[in-house]
């Protein structure tokens, strides 16, 4: 009986190792080719952020202020990733998308749809929140090593600025 258990454990470990090996050698992350690809870390500079949070109907105590935010954008195979990290809020979300195609995800339990497009060298994203009957338009404009993200909901426009940082080396 113990040989059977040992064999099952070894088989399970081999399967896990094979799965890990396969994931690590899929399509490699591409960080170049589009101006907006890369790792972007927020600066202390923002404009009209609290008004934007209020227009969304979110509590300022939780979402107001200038929390350090990291946006990582990369291409992997035929799709892109947009990973958003807010460390002091223990928040991390990875959105996979194809340019021009609508996708779905949840943000803190609320269903949202999104559609990323490219206009010239700039990335655009339209986020719809059906339960709140709200639409957010995001624009990502790169100027040198700085990314200016503009958020718009109704007549409220907010901006935050990000600096480009070195991305992690690919694990593939």
From Swiss-Prot:
UniProt record similarity statement: Belongs to the Secretory-abundant heat soluble protein (SAHS) family.
Knockout consequences: Affects slightly survival under dry conditions but does not affect survival under frozen conditions.
Gene Ontology molecular functions: lipid binding
Region SAHS-c1, annotated ranges: 30-59
Claim: Oxidoreductase is one of the keywords in the record: no
CDD domains: FABP (cd00742)
Major location category of this protein: secreted
Additional free-text comment from the UniProt record: Trehalose, a disaccharide essential for several organisms to survive drying, is detected at low levels or not at all in some tardigrade species, indicating that tardigrades possess potentially novel mechanisms for surviving desiccation involving tardigrade-specific intrinsically disordered proteins (TDPs).
Cellular component terms per the entry's GO annotation: extracellular region
tRNA processing is among the record's keywords: no
Record-given protein name: Secretory-abundant heat soluble protein 64681
Glycosylation: residue positions: 108, 133
Function according to Swiss-Prot or TrEMBL: Secreted heat soluble protein acting as a molecular shield in water-deficient condition. Tardigrade-specific intrinsically disordered proteins (TDPs) are essential for desiccation tolerance by forming non-crystalline amorphous solids upon desiccation, and this vitrified state mirrors their protective capabilities.
Subcellular location: Secreted
Signal peptide limits: 1-19
Induction, per UniProt: Expression is highly induced during desiccation.
SUPFAM superfamilies: Lipocalins
Note on domains (UniProt): SAHS-c1, SAHS-c2 and SAHS-c3 are 3 highly conserved regions within the SAHS protein family.
Residue ranges, annotated region (SAHS-c2): 74-102
Region (SAHS-c3): 115-164
Keyword annotations: Glycoprotein, Secreted, Signal, Stress response
